[in-house]
Amino acid sequence: MIQILKVNTQFYDESAIGSYDASRARVMYLKDFIENKDGYKLFYHKGKPIKREKDLQLLFKLTWFATIFDVNAEVNNGRGPVDFKISKGDLDKTLVEFKLASNSKLKQNIANQVQVYEAANNTNQSMKVILYFNEIEYKKVLNVLDELGLSSDENIILIDACNNKISASNV
């Protein structure tokens, strides 16, 4: 897989891109893997969802193999640890925060948490990634985003980990 990505894509060609674009490319790769390539199955055991934010974080960390970026997890530069800080030097930093849709503090976290981390890390580049496991959680996230006026925020990425994916032969 790594060789295919190196030869056929610019996935590992990071010389001309910044930390935000590199981070977004990896989040979108992870989203595609979970939603379209049966990656969602990693979050289930005996048909029941395993709702652990840490599992999603570990998968994200794997996407950074052979990178020129400095990728650090649980960086605490003040007022709490952000899930990931990806940087190339001091002037190019991006924060990535993962959340489960089932998180009871989801609205509060989306509204405030990353902005606090941005200030502590001297950056304004960040994204929030939210994983949901069913239609109820999906609607909850959409309602929260609507209430906060963030429905069209491109820095908030939703990932569908529902186990209701239909086989291509049944579409």
Which stretches of residues belong to each language-model region?
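The feature marks a conserved, polyanion-engaging helical scaffold used by nucleic-acid processing enzymes
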Residues: 1-65
